[in-house]
Amino acid sequence: MFIDEVIITVKAGNGGDGSAAFRREKFVQFGGPDGGDGGKGGDVIFVADSNINTLIDFKFKKLFKAQNGENGQKKQMYGKKGEDLIIKVPVGTQVRDFTTGKLILDMSVNGEQRVLLKGGKGGYGNVHFKNSIRKAPKIAEKGGEGAEIKVKLELKLLADVALVGYPSVGKSSFINKVSAANSKVGSYHFTTLEPKLGVVRLEEGKSFVIADIPGLIEGAHEGVGLGDKFLKHIERCKMIYHIVDVAEIEGRDCIEDFEKINHELKKFSEKLAGKKQIVIANKMDLIWDMEKFEKFKSYLAEKGIEIYPVSVLLNEGLKEILYKTYDMLSRIEREPLEEETDITKLLKELKIEKEDFEIIRDEEDAIVVGGRIVDDVLAKYVIGMDDESLVTFLHMMRSLGMEEALQEFGVQDGDTVKIADVEFEYFE
């Protein structure tokens, strides 16, 4: 099954907490702080793999998490680093933020590895908080939280040439003839239900890639038929083969066919309509009215579009097109890729920032202190409930501006102040 769009959530590993352990050994009276640092959380890494050609592996599993780092231990032992999460995707996969649609990663080169999210930093053990005044700190740092983001994976096939045209004009037969592709061929509409890639190999190592795009019909850009589901795969191609049934086997006019398909391309994207296009006039072996063919040829000449009469069935006229195409491709620059968004900046934009200090009175008339600074400190440190640790915590909050915020709120001597699980009476 060909799946080219999925929505998943990815999360980097959390860092392990630092340890607040103390050295306790026989004959060592004052062991001192002995807690090791936590291990770093695992990263989320995307890898482009040419052996994969669909996003079906993401159809049923929607949450992907890297491993957390392990906590630090006594004897200053570091926690083990969390294992990185490797996510393999087809070459041509774009990773976009689900909320904003911004491009984060464009996996366009086989084998490239890109870090999407970095794991949280491991927290410091209490040995880092020892100083000349605080010789036995009972405080340690929590591990940093691994970033999490909801993303849309979108596969856009990387081919040099895209085959477009109405259903049953011979696109699949063409790609099978000129490459090793194995597209299904049938005498009914929409025989090809998903894009297929084929490599055209000429002599002396010359080659290029063709994408067989499922047949388009009028109204495709609005979802008619197979709709615009696969039009995006043409966006990265350098040029277009527009295959037309000039024998008009199904009773349609070939000029109208040509105009309608180009109308659909333009409605989907001006970029598609502006791509270099050559017309392959197929089924010349079945044509009965050469006058209509000459009319079509003159019509295209007025527009400056090249036409190549061929019979795919009889293998006539194909070689000339392939060599001409190779020469043309060497002169066409691939369009520059869309600029990627810096993931660090994006995560900051998506984060809802609180005020530094958010202060209210509760139903018991106590002053409750919260806000971004409080959240950050509580998230960052493992704080013991002994007197020394609580004093250290309050000194930390005071240095970060809590007292000024309380005074601005209108705190009075004797007021009860609550911060998380800490409660105290305020005196200036």
UniProtKB/Swiss-Prot annotation:
Mg(2+) binds at S172, T192. SUPFAM superfamilies: Obg GTP-binding protein C-terminal domain, Obg GTP-binding protein N-terminal domain, P-loop containing nucleoside triphosphate hydrolases. It comes from the Bacteria. It holds the Pfam family GTP1_OBG. Residues 159-330 form the OBG-type G domain. Gene3D superfamilies: GTP-binding protein OBG, C-terminal domain, GTP1/OBG domain, P-loop containing nucleotide triphosphate hydrolases. It is found in: Cytoplasm. Keywords: Cytoplasm, GTP-binding, Hydrolase, Magnesium, Metal-binding, Nucleotide-binding. The keyword Transmembrane does not apply. GTP binds at residues 165-172, 190-194, 212-215, 282-285, 311-313. GO terms for molecular function: GTP binding; GTPase activity; magnesium ion binding. The keyword Nucleotide-binding applies. Its main location: cytoplasm. An essential GTPase which binds GTP, GDP and possibly (p)ppGpp with moderate affinity, with high nucleotide exchange rates and a fairly low GTP hydrolysis rate. Plays a role in control of the cell cycle, stress response, ribosome biogenesis and in those bacteria that undergo differentiation, in morphogenesis control. Belongs to the TRAFAC class OBG-HflX-like GTPase superfamily. OBG GTPase family. Monomer. This is GTPase Obg. It comes from Fusobacterium nucleatum subsp. nucleatum (strain ATCC 25586 / DSM 15643 / BCRC 10681 / CIP 101130 / JCM 8532 / KCTC 2640 / LMG 13131 / VPI 4355). The lineage of its organism: Bacteria, Fusobacteriati, Fusobacteriota, Fusobacteriia, Fusobacteriales. The gene is obg.
